[in-house]
Amino acid sequence: MFYINRNKQNFSLAFSYLENKSKNNFSFGSTKSSSKVKKLNFIHKIDNLFLMEIIGNKKNQSNWSENFQDKNYQITDYSINPTLTYFSGENNRINFIYKLSDIENSIGNQETLKQQNFGISLFLNQKEKRGFISEFNYYKNEFNGDINSVISYVMMNGLQNGENYTWRFKFQRKLSKLLDINFIYLGRKSNSTRTIHNGSIQLKAIF
């Protein structure tokens, strides 16, 4: 990772490179996967209330399966992701997010995807006693290929072709010095599927 002007108030620039490889042997055959990510991150503090962050990303992702050809892919993902953050007080902020991605598979049926993401997130904190997080995202997918394939699931991150909506709410409260409780609710909706709701309660003990 390479930094310019790190931890300065006006602006900073960081470049990172990550590479991962794995191989697994199963009774039905072996699989190999790899990923390479190059990321450029620019942060500019406009004033005490606003922060601008722009992330440029190139990701190469591949998978090879010995006996399941429909799981083989070599995906290249180019994305640009600007975020504007508004700070209200010391612990509260709102993020306005946009992300544009161009993704293509260079083997097999050579699927392509153009994805746009508009999002907003809200973070509220009260001196370590309680916290609230809410997120809402709108995705527009323009996918060219078989929408029922493994590759479409990977490229669209489990979303559907066309318009998608996702949301998340999380409330955290500190019950004592050793005990926290979290309430989490997740939802998603697309034009071709019914609304999916998922909720959970987590109790965390700190020793």
Stretch-by-stretch model annotation:
Residues M1-F207:
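Exposed, low-structure sequence patches enriched in small/polar residues
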